[in-house]
């Protein structure tokens, strides 16, 4: 498993390196083939801005990755707690011989949405 992770890491590093090379080549081609024209934004400047945006995206991705993991774990814990609660309620209803009323349309819709959401986890 760790070898696969290392292989993926190398693939991402190569892709990043390839993108840097492509950016360098584009900047060079633009500088040599298209001199700055008046009134238009310099394509090289646009590429540099794109590079800055890419860097900010990577930083955000690194910062929010742990948050996404924690969010997924929290959702799983909530679903587990919900399922336990529903099981407990059903057991209590059986033990007390409580007669259940049919669900309203709104309750049916909410239950369907909840089931769909829980299956996505």
UniProtKB/Swiss-Prot annotation:
Belongs to the SKA2 family. Gene3D superfamilies: 6.10.250.1380. The gene is SKA2. It comes from the Eukaryota. GO terms for molecular function: microtubule binding. One of its GO terms (biological process) is establishment of meiotic spindle orientation. It is found in: Cytoplasm, Cytoskeleton, Spindle; Chromosome, Centromere, Kinetochore; Cytoplasm, Cytoskeleton, Microtubule organizing center, Centrosome. This is SKA complex subunit 2. Its main location: cytoplasm. It comes from Bos taurus (Bovine).
